[in-house]
Each structure stands twice: as C-alpha cells, then as structure tokens.
C-alpha cells in the first residue's frame, strides 16, 4: 500500500458478503450520498450547538467543518474515515478569554479566533513531530489518568456557565429542565440511529414543546420566525477577522493537548473497527486536524476535531468508506451556504440551548470518568489520587495564575497541573526489591 497515494476504491454493495465496506472500498453513488446524509445528520447537533455556546456563527462553523473534513481527507490520503466537527474542548477557554455571556454573537469573537488559530498551529506542530518520532511520547506525557482528569475538569469548569444561561426567569429554568428530560428520554427509550442522534432529536422535540408553550399557550416569549421568512436560500455566511491577543492565545492554545489525546483515541477506535493499522497515518491525521482548525479560525469558525458521533455511525452501519465522508462534507458545505438555514438555527430558544448545554457539559465530565474505566486506571494509588483531586478542583473552581501580564485560566491550570503532577508523583522505586518474607521453623 502506497504511503502517500490515494487508494483505488473498489465498488462494493452492502448487500454482499457481511455488508462491511472497508475504507478503500466504495458504495454506488446513490448509497454513498445516503450514507453521507446520515453522517451529516450525526454531526449536526454538536457542530451547531458548540459555536452557539461560544457566540460564533453556526452556519459558518458547519461550512468550515465540511471544508475541514475535505482538507483532512486529502492530507491523510483518503485512508482515515473521519468527520471533523466543532470541538467542545474550545467552549470553556473561548468563554473565559472573551467574557462571553452566552447570548447572541460574541462581541470579542476576533481574539477568540486568534486563540483558535494558535491552538491549530500547536496541534499541527505536534502532528509533524508525531510523523517523525511516533506517539509514544504523547502517551507517556498524557496517560489515561491525566487525559481523563483534564476532560472531566473541562466539563466541571463549564457547569456554572450552563446553569447561569437558564437562570434569567423561572420559565426559562423550567424549559431548560424540559429540554434535559427530552434529551434523557431520547437517550434511554429509543434505539438505533435515533438514540445516537439524542442531542439533535432532543433539541427538536424541546423546540416544538417550547413553541407550543409560548406561541400557542402564551406562557413565555414567542418564537419569532421573521428572520427565517426573510432570509435567502443561498448566500455567503458572515466571515470574521481574527485578532491575535497574547493572553487569549495562551489560554486557548493548550487545548491542542486535549485534541491530540482525543484524536489518537478516535483513531485507535477506528483501527479496531476496520481492522486496519492506522499508526502510519496518526501524524498526518493530527496535521490535517490542526490545519483545519487554523483554516476555520481564520475566517470565523470554531476549532474542529474528529467526531465520536460519526465513529458511532460507522460502528452501526459497518460502512467505513472514506468517500462517504466526502459526501457528508459536501452536504455540510451546501448547508453552510444557506442563510435561511442559519436563520432557522438562530430561532432555537436560549432556554433550550441552555438545557442542552447542561447535558452536553455533563457528558464531557462523564467522558473523563469513562477514560479511566476503559483503561482501568488505579485511583487507589496516592499519586493518581492527588493528581486527579487537584486537577478537578483547579478546573471546577476556575483557578487562575497570573505571571508577567499573562493569565492562565482554570482549564489551562488544570491541564498543565495534571501533566506536571503526574510527572512528579508517578515515579516508582523500580530499583528497590520488595521485602523478603522469612518463614521461621515452628
């Protein structure tokens, strides 16, 4: 198999053999398009919600997710089946860097974009290093105990933001609770693809119930569809220019460490499902993700990462063809060029978004615990216990450190604190033999 060449995709139908379609195989055009729609739907919920939580344009973020996925496809030589969508890891640091209040468009979006570009640059450099020397150094620097602690700290750091966003009125608070229940019911009582799209389906159901409560029963502020009716079907999204603020860059750039760990985990999952060795492409995958993040941030989009939602779709369908993700990317780009679609997104009530954010931020925190469970992390070891305890409090309490005009926020201190504490506390006395047990004669 050529390292830098594109594969020769062989035509295959899902009706043949076991129905498994490998990354270097393809479906007929119609089936590829349908699978592309399915992957576009799978990424939709989070790719729309994350930029809204940061005050970015969701329409532009969807467009850039499609462009970023195509860039990733070309850089990896069409051999890694993945979709790049808006990353939740940026939410906390972008809000901290810009002081965004969670409503409307972020007035300090420019400095956030500069930080996203800086993060993408760090991400790309790490990818280039991985291409040269492999991933062992990353796994030693950030073992599962560190990765899990940092991911959980991010979720806990975001918790106050989610709660404050739904505290404007008693009605908003109850509608947020209703949204949480809608998503929870979808997660528990549905199966298959509907269950995998729990955020999207839950949002739709919650919006419908909110519309009934307000537009029909008059219990709250009615949803206004004027912008939707006046918006054009096709047009350019709103682009923004980045500004490079050193403090914002210092705060946002460390997210690259989380994205690297997340991407490596996703690639290992894909390798396990496809039976293909993805190690030769890990460096290029990181470079592709980093460049896509820089490109997105340069025009006003959010930082991107490979999506677990789409990995779940592959696990269900057994279709791993990389051409399916090209189709999904094209669909996302078409949606990004529709102002009417963007206007429809902006009709989602703030209370519904806040309720969804409670679930999403909670799931981020739980994902950290899942990393520990899956990797059998031993929290009975004092070194691990102290590192995790300190990391969680630094993140949840938004502990900040200021040095020479630079301020490192809670997520930054939690990330670097976890790495440093793990390096200091995980030492073992490997040269000291265990005490010898002497058996005395009776």
Task: List each language-model region with its residue ranges.
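Intrinsically disordered, low-complexity non-transmembrane regions of multi-pass membrane transporters
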Residues: 1-34, 219-238, 272-275, 285, ...
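N-terminal signal-anchor module of multipass membrane proteins
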Residues: 2-81, 89-105
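Juxtamembrane interface elements at the cytosolic ends of transmembrane helices
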Residues: 10-11, 16, 44-47, 181-189, ...
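Membrane-embedded helical hairpins/re-entrant loop segments and their flanking transmembrane helices
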Residues: 15, 19-30, 55-73, 251-322, ...
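Hydrophobic, membrane-embedded alpha-helices of multi-pass small-molecule transporters
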Residues: 33-43, 172-179, 197-198, 236-266, ...
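Re-entrant/interfacial helical elements at transmembrane boundaries that shape
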Residues: 48-53, 83-96, 265-274, 304-316, ...
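Juxtamembrane helix-boundary/capping and inter-helix hinge elements in multi-pass membrane proteins
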Residues: 53-56, 78, 99-107, 131, ...
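Membrane-embedded alpha-helical modules
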Residues: 106-216, 327-436
């Amino acid at each position: 198999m050529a390292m830098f060449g594109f594969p020769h995709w062989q035509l295959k139908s899902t009706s043949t053999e076991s129905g498994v379609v490998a990354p270097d195989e393809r479906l007929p055009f119609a089936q590829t398009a349908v699978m592309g729609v399915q992957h576009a739907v799978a990424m939709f919920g989070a790719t729309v919600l994350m930029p809204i939580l940061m005050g970015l344009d969701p329409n532009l973020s969807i467009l850039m997710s499609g462009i970023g996925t195509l860039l990733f496809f070309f850089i990896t030589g069409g051999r890694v089946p993945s979709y790049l969508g808006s990353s939740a890891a940026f939410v906390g640091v972008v809000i901290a860097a810009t002081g965004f209040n969670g409503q409307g468009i972020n007035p300090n979006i420019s400095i956030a974009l500069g930080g996203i570009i800086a993060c993408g640059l760090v991400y790309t450099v790490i990818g280039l290093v991985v291409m040269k020397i492999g991933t062992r150094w990353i796994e030693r620097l950030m073992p599962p105990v560190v990765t899990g602690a940092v991911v959980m700290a991010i979720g806990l750091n975001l918790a106050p933001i989610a709660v404050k966003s739904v505290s404007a009125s008693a009605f908003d608070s109850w509608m947020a609770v209703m949204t949480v229940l809608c998503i929870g019911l979808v997660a528990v009582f549905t199966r298959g693809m509907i269950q995998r799209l729990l955020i999207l389906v839950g949002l739709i159901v919650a919006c419908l119930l909110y519309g009934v409560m307000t537009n029909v029963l008059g219990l709250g502020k009615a949803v206004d569809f004027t912008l939707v009716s006046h918006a054009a079907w096709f047009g350019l999204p709103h682009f923004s220019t980045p500004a490079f603020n050193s403090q914002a860059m210092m705060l946002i750039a460390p997210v690259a460490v989380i994205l690297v760990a997340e991407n490596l985990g996703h690639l290992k999952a894909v390798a396990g499902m496809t039976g293909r060795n993805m190690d030769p492409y890990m460096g290029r995958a990181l470079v592709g993700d980093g460049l896509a993040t820089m490109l997105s941030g340069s025009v006003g989009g959010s930082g991107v990462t490979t999506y677990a939602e789409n990995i779940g779709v592959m696990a269900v369908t057994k279709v791993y063809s990389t051409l399916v993700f090209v189709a999904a990317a094209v669909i996302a780009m078409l949606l990004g060029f529709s102002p009417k679609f963007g206007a429809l997104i902006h009709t989602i009530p703030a209370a519904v978004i806040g309720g969804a954010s409670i679930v999403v931020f909670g799931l981020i925190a739980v994902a950290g615990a899942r990393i520990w469970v899956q990797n059998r992390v031993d929290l009975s070891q004092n070194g691990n216990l102290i590192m995790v305890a300190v990391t969680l409090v630094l993140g949840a309490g938004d502990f900040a450190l200021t040095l020479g005009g630079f301020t490192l926020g809670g997520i930054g201190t939690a990330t670097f604190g976890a790495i440093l504490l793990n390096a200091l506390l995980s030492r073992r006395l490997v040269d000291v033999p265990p005490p010898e047990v002497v058996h005395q004669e009776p």
